[in-house]
């Protein structure tokens, strides 16, 4: 029921629904050998991970040329938003950055099986040349001050960052503002009343 409810809420095509279901099956299969998601969250994967990732697309003001997902790990949100973009903006490209080789292998397998317009970089974020991304996402990767430092070199001039954050977001924002100037919107999360999505732009070090 959870799967049907989430797919109905997302209001996506049959092909996108099938790809999301295929991806969830891949995560569940690989999770037995590679720690992709917490075992306690497997039963709630459709809300805790799929919907939580998919909601990021609702905060776009235009379709991105390049979406950069940092610390992609299990493919949430990177793979999910790439699946949804296949219908909505097939011209968009996705770059998923993951330094863990086993997780990068999983991501490549998922991209290949799902025929996604996505590249996987098995590298540390700090080692990458500037990507000039229109959208940068990162989920459960680092505290906001560190995320700003990781994202800033790769953000296009009019690009945005979308960072899902939990209950501690207020203190993270205060810490980030000590070192970074930014325009910020704090948006409600569809999956957790205590969580938010931070939408940042015009990132500049103080």
From Swiss-Prot:
Gene3D superfamilies linked: Vaccinia Virus protein VP39
One GO MF term attached to the UniProt entry: rRNA (guanine-N7-)-methyltransferase activity
Origin: domain of life: Bacteria
Statement: the UniProt record of this protein carries the keyword Signal: no
UniProt-listed Pfam families: GidB (PF02527)
Record function comment: Specifically methylates the N7 position of guanine in position 527 of 16S rRNA.
Protein family per UniProt: Belongs to the methyltransferase superfamily. RNA methyltransferase RsmG family.
Name of the protein: Ribosomal RNA small subunit methyltransferase G
Biological source species: Cereibacter sphaeroides (strain ATCC 17029 / ATH 2.4.9) (Rhodobacter sphaeroides)
Origin organism lineage: Bacteria, Pseudomonadati, Pseudomonadota, Alphaproteobacteria, Rhodobacterales
């Amino acid at each position: 029921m959870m799967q049907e409810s989430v797919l109905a809420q997302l209001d996506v095509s049959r092909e996108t629904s099938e790809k999301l279901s295929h991806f969830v099956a891949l995560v569940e299969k690989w999770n037995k050998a590679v720690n992709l998601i917490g075992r306690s969250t497997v039963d709630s994967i459709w809300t805790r991970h799929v919907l939580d990732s998919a909601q990021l697309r609702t905060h776009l003001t235009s379709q991105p040329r390049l979406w950069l997902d940092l610390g992609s790990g299990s493919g949430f949100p990177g793979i999910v938003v790439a699946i949804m973009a296949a219908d909505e903006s097939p011209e968009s490209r996705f770059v998923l950055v993951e330094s863990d080789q086993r997780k990068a292998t999983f991501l490549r397998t998922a991209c290949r099986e799902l025929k996604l317009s996505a590249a996987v970089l098995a590298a540390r974020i700090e080692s990458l040349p500037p990507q000039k991304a229109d959208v940068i996402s990162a989920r459960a990767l680092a505290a906001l001050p560190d995320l700003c430092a990781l994202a800033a070199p790769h953000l296009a001039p009019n690009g945005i960052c979308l960072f899902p954050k939990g209950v501690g977001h207020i203190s993270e924002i205060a810490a980030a503002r000590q070192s970074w100037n930014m325009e910020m919107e704090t948006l409600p999360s569809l999956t957790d009343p205590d969580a938010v999505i931070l939408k940042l732009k015009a990132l500049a070090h103080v």
